[in-house]
Amino acid sequence: MRRILLKAMLGGPTLWVAMVMVLGAWAVQAQAAATTLTVWHAYRGKEKAAFEKVVANYSKRAAAKGIEVTTLAVPYDAYADKITAAVPRGKGPDVFIFAQDRLGGWVEGGVTVEPIGFFLDDQTRSQFLPNMLEAMTYRDTVYGLPLNYKSITLIYNKKLVATPPKTSGELVKLAKRLTDAAAGRFGLAYAYNDFYYHAALQNAFGGRAFDPGPKPVLNAPQNIAAMKLLLKWIRQDAILPAEPSSALITSLFNEGKAAMVFSGPWFLGEIAPGIDYGLALLPTIDEAGGKPMRPWLTIEGVYVSASSRQKEAAYELAKYLVSEEAGLVLTVEGRQLHTNKAVYTHKAVADDPVLAAFRRQLDSATPMPNFAEMTVMWSPATTAMNTIVRGSATPEVALERAQRSVEKDIAALRKGR
């Protein structure tokens, strides 16, 4: 190159100008060859800071390959609709983060998520905690890499509860002692009229939303049995507040008027600084033969957009995000529950009581269904829950109505495909 430049300088102005033009063309080509990957997410606060730190670390390393990574935080309320609208039209991100409950709908709708089984190697498959990769699988095809998980667990006020209950019998006995409804104090508080929270109790009985097919079974006998136990906790044992909104539950716990709650990691940020709290496994259910409560797992995955023009580079980024190195930052700094099992061998994670507690709860949790049909289950199930707890219908009647409603909606959904 030095000889070429010297000849150009000695060759006079014409040759020099020509040489400058050639070098400029090379620079333009090099710039055009650079790859920019765009990642969408909905994180805020510590999660956002940790995620962007991890992406920046990757971007620095990938710069040598001509790869630059940018991130965009999308408000959660508009996030799913934005993906559904943008990606099939060839717009939007190369990579996006979202929970598994929308996966089936996106696959059935087409041109949103890219199958990634072709890229997956055995080492990557084996690095995840149990049930994680399965949540990213739809009709035997893998569409995403699992990034983090969330579930509910038992959170208790240490000032009021010395030893957390291990069984439903212990739970009710302790909660009764700590309840004074007239004074607005309750032994237990959780959003029991929300089907997501109720699923933990339902699953203990062997209940479920769907049988294989998927076939909806909201009216299954096990679901009815779970609802009857919930009604006992509300009416006979009287250990739960009426109208359990998230705002009420937070207020009760922070005022020392709720000794225990069933909730997830999102609740911890709402706990007042002066509350000394602990976490424990959800209790086993005596009425279900001693089976554990099995909360639903919400598993966020890293998806490669079907419209991305650089799918291989996008997958390599996704693979890094689920690595041990990235996972340690996302877990320790972002307070996420990463899916890479090696992360939990690090002292900073293993010695953290909050992270360790949610990791223990994982062993008795189950992934939330990712069927397309799941989207039409929520409204009828929620209506049934509210009807039952208000006493407007028996569990048998309300769940049968919900079953018929879901069957009708699923038939319409499948007809429209």
What are these regions (language model features)?
Residues 141-147, 152, 170-216, 222, ...:
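Extracytoplasmic/periplasmic solute-binding protein
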Residues 11-25:
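Bacterial N-terminal signal peptides
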Residues 99-151, 163, 168-174, 200, ...:
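Hinge/lid segment of periplasmic solute-binding proteins
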